[in-house]
Amino acid sequence: MEAVTAIKPLIRVAALSGSLRKTSFHTGLLRAAIDLTKESVPGLQIEYIDISPLPLINTDLEVNGTYPPVVEAFRQKILEADSILFASPEYNFSVSAPLKNALDWASRPPNVWADKPAAIISTGGGFGGGRSQYHLRQIGVFLDLHFINKPEFTLNAFQPPQKFDAEGNLVDEVTKERLKQVLLSLQAFTLRLQGK
């Protein structure tokens, strides 16, 4: 008798990096996550959403319930996603300004973050960006985001062994496995919230 493998429904994940730097380690984590889903996490499809084109939030830009085209396109991508993957750097114990700006634009009526499962990954020195995660979780309460609790993913990018190459690509295999566990947890949590 042949083994039957259950095919998991496709989960679309919108991935946002709070760092705009060209060789950002956070964007590198998202590239690695995309590669991992292609290699070893079937049923998960990650799309990187570039937040750099978003204008600073300004309600004067809202006209008759509509937003600038770049904001409308961003909001539509969030709306169409089943879940969210945030790569959140820590700036002054908090989230970065570009990420907060994206959170604010997508929270304008109607709030397109509402009821989305989410996960946070962070890297940096010292605490590996962990303090930004707690602030992002706090913001997420108001936005009705539902974060996975475990595994937490923080990474000291400057401790040996080398974690990233000169272009910001994740090269450490142990870290890739930790990242994979976050993706599997996000997948399972999303399916649970969807009742599947």
Curated annotation (Swiss-Prot):
Q: Where in the cell is it found?
A: Cell membrane
EC no. given is 1.6.5.2
Note the superkingdom of the native organism: Eukaryota
User: Which keywords appear in this protein's UniProt record, sorted alphabetically?
Assistant: Cell membrane, Flavoprotein, FMN, Membrane, NAD, NADP, Oxidoreductase
Q: According to the UniProt record, what class of enzyme is this?
A: oxidoreductase
- What are its cofactors? FMN
Q: In the UniProt record, does the keyword Secreted occur?
A: no
Give GO MF terms, alphabetically.
NADH:ubiquinone reductase (non-electrogenic) activity; NADPH dehydrogenase (quinone) activity
Coiled-coil stretches are none
Catalyzed chemical reaction(s): a quinone + NADH + H(+) = a quinol + NAD(+); a quinone + NADPH + H(+) = a quinol + NADP(+)
Which InterPro entries does the UniProt entry name for this protein?
Flavoprotein-like_sf, FMN_Rdtase-like_dom, NAD(P)H-dep_reductase
Does Flavoprotein count among this protein's keywords? yes
* Gene Ontology cellular component list: chloroplast; chloroplast stroma; cytosol; plasma membrane
The family line of this record is: Belongs to the SsuE family.
Q: Which PANTHER family match?
A: CHROMATE REDUCTASE, NAD(P)H-DEPENDENT FMN REDUCTASE LOT6
Q: Quaternary arrangement and interactors, per the entry?
A: Homotetramer.
Tell me, what does this protein do in biology? The enzyme apparently serves as a quinone reductase in connection with conjugation reactions of hydroquinones involved in detoxification pathways.
Full protein name: NADPH:quinone oxidoreductase
The organism is Arabidopsis thaliana
